Amino acid sequence: MAKGNSPLERPSLASLDQKLAFAKRCSHEGVLAGAKAAVVASVASAIPTLASVRMLPWARANLNHTAQALIISTATAAAYFIVADKTVLATARKNSFNQPSNSEA
């Protein structure tokens, strides 16, 4: 086994710092992508929800302000978490293939 590849060896402090910085960068990219998706989803769900309450008699009678807010916020939260999760996983997957192995040094 090449030096540095043994699972019994303790990782160096520099290696841990590098992994921590990578994790922070991945999560930051996920937060930004999730926030962008949440804004788009809130607008995309608010417009038809509010329009239907004004134009459809059934929606006017059955969807109060709380129901409207719940519809919009559910779509927003779902978009945020789905996109953030996919972005973090994609970034980690992409960068895991780019890491040089210790045996090549």
Swiss-Prot record:
TM stretches of this protein: 66-83
Any single Gene Ontology cellular-component annotation: membrane
Membrane association type: Single-pass membrane protein
Location in the cell: Membrane
Keywords: Membrane, Nodulation, Transmembrane, Transmembrane helix
Xref: InterPro entries: Enod93
Annotated GO biological process: nodulation
Domain of life: Eukaryota
Name under which the protein is recorded: Early nodulin-93
UniProt source species: Glycine max
